[in-house]
UniProtKB/Swiss-Prot annotation:
Superkingdom field: Viruses
Protein name: Genome polyprotein
A Gene Ontology term for the protein's cellular component: extracellular region
Ranges in the topological domain labelled Cytoplasmic: 1-104, 266-270
Any GO BP: fusion of virus membrane with host endosome membrane
Matches recorded under InterPro entries: Env_glycoprot_M_flavivir, Env_glycoprot_M_sf_flavivir, Flav_gly_cen_dom_subdom1, Flavi_capsidC, Flavi_capsidC_sf, Flavi_E_Ig-like, Flavi_E_Stem/Anchor_dom, Flavi_E_Stem/Anchor_dom_sf
Record remark: domains: The transmembrane domains of the small envelope protein M and envelope protein E contain an endoplasmic reticulum retention signal.
Keyword Transcription: no
Organism: Yellow fever virus (isolate Peru/1899/1981) (YFV)
SUPFAM superfamilies named among the record's database cross-references: E set domains, Viral glycoprotein, central and dimerisation domains
Amino acid sequence: MSGRKAQGKTLGVNMVRQGVRSLSNKIKQKTKQIGNRPGPSRGVQGFIFFFLFNVLTGRKITAHLKKLWRMLDPRQGLAVLKKVKRVVASLMRGLSSRKRRSYEVLTVQFLILGMLLMTGGVTLVRKSRWLLLNVTSEDLGKTFSVGTGNCTTNILEAKNWCPDSMEYNCPNLSPREEPDDIDCWCYGVENVRVAYGKCDSAGRSRRSRRAIDLPTHENHGLKTRQEKWMTGRMGERQLQKIERWLVRNPFFAVTALAIAYLVGSNMTQRVVIALLVLAVGPAYSAHCIGITDRDFIEGVHGGTWVSATLEQDKCVTVMAPDKPSLDISLETVAIDGPAEARKVCYSAVLTHVKINDKCPSTGEAHLAEENEGDHACKRTYSDRGWGNGCGLFGKGSIVACAKFTCAKSMSLFEVDQTKIQYVIRAQLHVGAKQENWNADIKTLKFDALSGSQEAEFTGYGKATLECQVQTAVDFSNSYIAEMEKESWIVDRQWAQDLTLPWQSGSGGVWREMHHLVEFEPPHAATIKVLALGNQEGSLKTALTGAMRVTKDTNGSNLYKLHGGHVSCRVKLSALTLKGTSYKMCTDKMSFVKNPTDTGHGTAVMQVKVPKGAPCRIPVMVADDLTASVNKGILVTVNPIASTNEDEVLIEVNPPFGDSYIIVGTGDSRLTYQWHKEGSSIGKLFTQTMKGAERLAVMGDAAWDFSSAGGFFTSVGKGIHMVFGSAFQGLFGGLSWITKVIMGAVLIWVGINMRNMTMSMSMILVGVIMMFLSLGVGADQGCAINFGKRELKCGDGVFIFRDSDDWLNKYSYYPEDPVKLASIVKASFEEGKCGLNSVDSLEHEMWRSRADEINAILEENEVDISVVVQDPKNIYQRGTHPFSRIRDGLQYGWKTWGKNLVFSPGRKNGSFIIDGKSRKECPFSNRVWNSLQIEEFGTGVFTTRVYMDAVFEYTMDCDGSILGAAVNGKKSAHGSPTFWMGSHEVNGTWMIHTLETLDYKECEWPLTHTIGTSVEESDMFMPRSIGGPVSSHNHIPGYKVQTNGPWMQVPLEVKREACPGTSVVVDGGCDGRGKSTRSTTDSGKIIPEWCCRSCTMPPVSFHGSDGCWYPMEIRPRKTHDNHLVRSWVTAGEVHAVPFGLVSMMIAMEVFLKKRQGPKQILVG
């Protein structure tokens, strides 16, 4: 038994070691097998595929993987990647050839392709803490594995990649959350953004079709007759020129038609050639004959100066006894080398659009591009909640920025008055043939430095011209606008008001870029941003009415105007007639061209002298063939024939009606019957109207009616334009009261005359005389008289010393009382309890019209009364604008008549106007700055001022009654209740006079400010209470008076000590504090004052409560308990009544029904 046990004994075996030994043997066998295979091992291939998978799916590349990649044999790695490349190329060829493959093969290849890269599709790039998903149009509706989750894009706007791209967040949604108002979303992965290009296959991006509504330039041009852009008159003018040339040159016209017929091979070519030749024909006209508008100066003595204003496309013919006639015209007005002032962009390109968003209650969204000057940004709010990545419903912050690049711009050049050249053309009427005219044409150039110049004509002497370039067209408020190859003269204010991006001429960032960028309404996490299309069409349409300018094509920076005028003086004393000693031509002459109407009331003819030259050609215009007295005027004075067979051009001015033009003497004379339409009286009226039109265009530079000179030297408006200077010349020596009495007598006589024609004539003359005696000459432009404290602007005048007239001589009305009552009702219903006036003028309107507004409210059964309280000339700021009207009110005649007699009663609700801030109606619940002056009307005794409501809240004061002017070293900023006069001393502007009649808290607008480069702390009067932000609002040694006694109105600032006090400069004096009155609370004078570094004499405020010192000047020995301190914390007008116009209406009543003297006096 023991033997069996020994024989069957079991031995212990270590199975772990046995398994390791077995596995080791297998690995050695497999390694040997792999090593014997050619090419990269499967391990290398697997590692490369795994590495590519991590790269393409956006997984993090660990440090261990990077180390293995660096250890990889380059030859084996390249071999694997080449295989991958061959597989991808094969798949692409298969797709392009549309061949059918087996399901198994396609499955394997697509799996490999998905691991490598969906070629041409999505790519994932890590950008800081963000994963950036780049997609194209091929990825519409696809879902991609990103990190530990997946993202889906459904972006219809995604196309081909280009600089016009979008980038924004892909919200991360909860697992069961459905997307809402988003086109990119993720599940299980944070911080993913999507980017895509928006260009089509041709590289074009979508633009907004919206056109900008630009203000038209019409009625903003220069005050001159001109060729205007898009007025539709140029074709008409050229046709008129062609018509006149055809009538006057029939032989050449027939020749042109014959050439066209022979040269052209078909009818179309013949018509085109004929039109081209005929269009060029008028260019060969000369003298003033072929010019549309022409004026004559007749009967002027040659030794005196003749005043004339020259315009382009017009001509003046000067005739004097024993002098040759002279044609002068303005050839061109050119501007040399203007400086570029600004650029206006009308076509922009947007690129690199980025958007960021935030959920509600998580703060504001921000982009780094917001701080870059070349980006247009918009910040707004979008609806967020479940379905777009937010846990709370509400408004979330969203901001979008796009890089702005201007593709096309219009340059604006500033015109330097000293660089303007006027080219004047002068030509003598000597009867020479057209081919010899060049010798008789002289060209003179005038600029700002030119004096008088002489035009010398061989054999005839010299004509002297002196042109006042400084008083010609005013370019100070104009720019030259150049857009591609076209140029215009435009109004400076119009150009600055264009709603287009702009930059200064020296470059820099574009301002107001938002005008060419359209931000569509936001979605949850994105905003569509589009560039507006090319606005060239809108801009050219807006330029309607602007004067055309032509740029010189030879490379110079010279611009030629198609309009303009210049005032000149002409002297003919050095001109002499040629051939006065020649004998008369007696041989038979002939008409080469029969007498033809020039269109200016004259007749022109061409006469041929066969022999007997040199001789004088006798020409006369008579009533009949037997008359011997010349009834016409020779424009071509003393026509002479220099050689035999000479052809002489002669121009005459026949009388009105039938006449005969007689050339030569005796039986061989030439006769031609002539008829001139019109009459001498009609000519007088025509010339007067012509002069009136010219005066309206020229202003004070206009010479006279019909170029006669010296009768009308200045203009106003209306009657003053035509009759003003004549009235002054006839009655200038009479006193004012005498002229008024004469006018009244003429009206009285006219009323009592039985003959209707004489009655109307006398009344008209009397009314004109009284009007010219009592009215204002309506000055144009802006001017300021510092001695009289008078500021003139536009056609209005206001005088500060008479500023109380704004409350006494002016009546204030709402533009529409019913509308204002409706606005009061709407505002009250929205919880606004009242209104604070901006200044005394608005308060006066409410005070005088409260009853009328209450009557309207009462008629419509509105339980509200407008209650006007006394503000003591202190007008503080409210916080709301007017509410818009929801329903209109009615206002009948019955209520109107009742309101004239009875005042409406008080209602339960009160709309408080001004007064103090009380608990029932605090300033925080009042309307403010919601009325502006609309226009100025006329009345018999007072001027009416109409105010209209505005619905936008603004801090700026109404600019309708503000003015600013500078003249040399003096300047002024003024309004009806404020005047600040400044002067310059050693290069520093300082206030010398400051007066204010009321306290107001609107801000002086920059549009009515001179010298805006100033730190607000260096100003004297604070900005928040109407102090102009100007370097002229400054007093050396005194800072901004935020605690000045500004409420002590009326207030005047003077450079003098308060009565009974003295001020010394002491470095140990107290610092700035609240302004202090010079007397104690008991009225005792505080004699001693000091300041640390103020300038002398000291500044003092003289107000309604005594004299005050500014914040820098402090009392020396008075206890604080007795001081009185300031409690302020400042954070086109017709000046003369025009009511006499209504008298003319009343005259019609008198004329229709005869009134006796007694009835007139009583009635």
